[in-house]
């Protein structure tokens, strides 16, 4: 048997492959200028602690990505066009949503009065078919005057294997957003949690009560203006046994 590598003949040439996959992640849409909504000073909200690590002197702008420009790339344009066509065919007077594409993910920013009909269209229209809502997340931007509270909905199309987000912003003085439980019943407890933690009131929810904190708990613990130290609670009736009666762990 010869060890001469010249005896090895190359196989047939395969089909040409594109240099880069043409997906939304690899072909990002051009975006506008970022939008600053606040500034962060130091770490974790702690003040006046005599910090010597240097982190207490950090100053960082809090910015949100700007609006995306057409073409968005990949299937993003198909979803945006399908949503516009479906709402128009349904006779809905829906304001054109702001579209933000960041880190390969698309978000539609809606007015609160448009949320429920848009959710209905996204679920039912055959071009869209976002059958599943994974929940709603709350975000608090205390320096974004008139838009302090944001509700972010995460939708999945199992038919088309696509994920999008819807986002609605409301003022702290009027924190009302329509509930989408009539469209996505599994959002029930998620809306209760967002109400409990952020104080967003979901109008039309079947039973909007606290879900983590006691019913009489003051405030909403995940807001930026909530005290870092929490609320002092006094426990009564506790006893500490003498050392010779304590449990041994040896």
From Swiss-Prot:
**This protein's record includes keyword NAD:** yes
Q: What is its EC number?
A: 7.1.1.-
For this UniProt record, the keywords arranged alphabetically read as follows:
Cell membrane, Membrane, NAD, Quinone, Translocase, Transport
Substrates-to-products reaction catalysed: a quinone + NADH + 5 H(+)(in) = a quinol + NAD(+) + 4 H(+)(out)
Q: Name one Pfam family in it.
A: Complex1_30kDa
First-tier enzyme category under EC:
translocase
Under the heading InterPro entries, the entry gives: NADH_DH_suC, NADH_quin_OxRdtase_su_C/D-like, NADH_UbQ_OxRdtase_30kDa_su
Instruction: Tell me the compartments it is located in.
Output: Cell membrane
Chief location bin: membrane
- The question of whether NAD is a record keyword is answered with yes
Q: How does it sit in the membrane?
A: Peripheral membrane protein
SUPFAM superfamilies tied to this protein: Nqo5-like
Disulfide-bonded cysteine pairs: these are: none
Outline the segment boundaries, as ranges, of region: Disordered: 1-33, 228-250
Q: Cite a single GO MF annotation.
A: quinone binding
Query: Mind telling me which GO cellular component terms the entry cites?
Result: plasma membrane
Oligomeric state and interaction partners are given as:
NDH-1 is composed of 14 different subunits. Subunits NuoB, C, D, E, F, and G constitute the peripheral sector of the complex.
Which NCBIfam families does the record associate with it? NuoC_fam, PRK07785.1
Function statement: NDH-1 shuttles electrons from NADH, via FMN and iron-sulfur (Fe-S) centers, to quinones in the respiratory chain. The immediate electron acceptor for the enzyme in this species is believed to be a menaquinone. Couples the redox reaction to proton translocation (for every two electrons transferred, four hydrogen ions are translocated across the cytoplasmic membrane), and thus conserves the redox energy in a proton gradient.
Q: Which family does it belong to?
A: Belongs to the complex I 30 kDa subunit family.
Q: What is this protein called?
A: NADH-quinone oxidoreductase subunit C
Question: Could you tell me which species this protein originates from?
Answer: Nocardioides sp. (strain ATCC BAA-499 / JS614)
Species lineage, top-down?
Answer: Bacteria, Bacillati, Actinomycetota, Actinomycetes, Propionibacteriales
């Amino acid at each position: 048997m010869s060890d001469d590598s010249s005896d090895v003949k190359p196989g047939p040439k395969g089909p040409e492959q594109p240099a880069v996959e043409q997906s939304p992640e690899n072909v990002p849409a051009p975006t506008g200028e970022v939008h600053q909504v606040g500034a962060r000073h130091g770490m974790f909200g702690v003040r006046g602690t005599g910090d010597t690590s240097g982190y207490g002197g950090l100053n960082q702008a809090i910015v949100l990505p700007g609006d995306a420009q057409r073409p968005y790339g990949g299937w993003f344009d198909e979803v945006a066009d399908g949503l516009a066509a479906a709402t128009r065919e349904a006779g809905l007077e829906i304001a054109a949503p702001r579209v933000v594409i960041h880190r390969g993910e698309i978000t539609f920013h809606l007015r609160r009065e448009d949320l429920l009909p848009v959710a209905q269209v996204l679920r039912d229209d055959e071009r869209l078919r976002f059958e599943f809502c994974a929940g709603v997340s709350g975000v608090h931007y205390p320096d974004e005057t008139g838009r302090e509270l944001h509700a972010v909905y995460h939708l999945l199309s199992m038919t088309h294997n696509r994920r999008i987000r819807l986002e609605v912003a409301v003022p702290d003085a009027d924190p009302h957003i329509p509930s989408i439980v009539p469209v996505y019943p599994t959002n029930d407890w998620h809306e209760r949690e967002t109400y409990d933690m952020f104080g967003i009131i979901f109008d039309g929810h079947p039973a909007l009560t606290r879900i983590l904190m006691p019913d009489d708990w003051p405030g909403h613990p995940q807001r930026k203006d909530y005290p870092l130290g929490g609320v002092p609670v006094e426990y009564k009736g506790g006893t500490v046994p003498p050392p010779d009666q304590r449990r041994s762990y040896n």
